[in-house]
Swiss-Prot record:
GO terms for molecular function: rRNA binding; structural constituent of ribosome; tRNA binding. Part of the 50S ribosomal subunit; part of the 5S rRNA/L5/L18/L25 subcomplex. Contacts the 5S rRNA and the P site tRNA. Forms a bridge to the 30S subunit in the 70S ribosome. It comes from Dinoroseobacter shibae (strain DSM 16493 / NCIMB 14021 / DFL 12). One of its GO terms (biological process) is translation. Pfam families: Ribosomal_L5, Ribosomal_L5_C. Keywords: Ribonucleoprotein, Ribosomal protein, RNA-binding, rRNA-binding, tRNA-binding. This is Large ribosomal subunit protein uL5.
Length: 187
């Protein structure tokens, strides 16, 4: 059994032992605090039209996202009414969760080593999906690629957004950091 007091996630240990030194050498940082690190990972499931018709769909998305993240997700609600979409203010539309610390490193490890290889016809993620400030966004068409989701008990297959926020000053630094974490970029 793992001792919670001494356990360190695999990617967090790799960052401390090898990735920091490699990044410092690659970019010539003068100060250790200049070295980019992961800040947070935000997961989002938008239930969309299904949630408008049935409010239980947002609760289902929340339960699935909580299982994937390992911490409770919050239900996202509409900020304002839009008559064309039949959406009313405060209507539940999906779920989101923000991961930091050890849970963030554990999720990134599961995403890269378990979930991405399970995606059909997977050829890597786009290397151009950075926002100009060192953050990376990717989308999955099916949330069932995560082992925490029991395929037989899923009533709806959701797409999900994953935003990886770093402290990097540029996209090149953030891409190098994620490459050191073995993110499978296709370009």
């Amino acid at each position: 059994m793992l001792d919670a007091a001494t356990y360190t996630p695999r990617l967090k240990a790799a960052y401390a032992e090898t990735i920091r030194a490699a990044m410092k050498e690659e970019f010539g940082y003068k100060n250790d605090m200049m070295i980019p690190r992961l800040d947070k990972i935000v997961l989002n499931i938008g239930a969309g039209a299904e949630a408008v018709k049935d409010s239980k769909k947002a609760k289902s998305a929340q339960d699935d996202l909580s299982a994937i993240a390992g911490q409770r997700a919050v239900i996202t609600k509409a900020k304002k009414s839009i008559a064309g979409f039949r959406v009313r203010e405060d209507m539940p539309l999906g779920a989101k969760v923000t991961l930091r610390g050890d849970r963030m490193y554990e999720f990134l490890d599961r995403l890269i080593t378990i979930a991405m290889p399970r995606i059909r016809d997977f050829r890597g993620v786009k290397g151009s999906a950075f926002d100009g400030r060192g953050n990376y966004a990717l989308g999955l068409k099916e949330h069932i690629v995560f082992p925490e989701i029991n395929f037989d008990k899923v009533d709806e297959v959701w797409g999900m957004d994953i935003i990886i926020c770093t402290t990097a000053a540029s996209d090149a630094e953030a891409k190098a950091l994620l490459k050191h974490f073995n993110m499978p970029f296709n370009s």
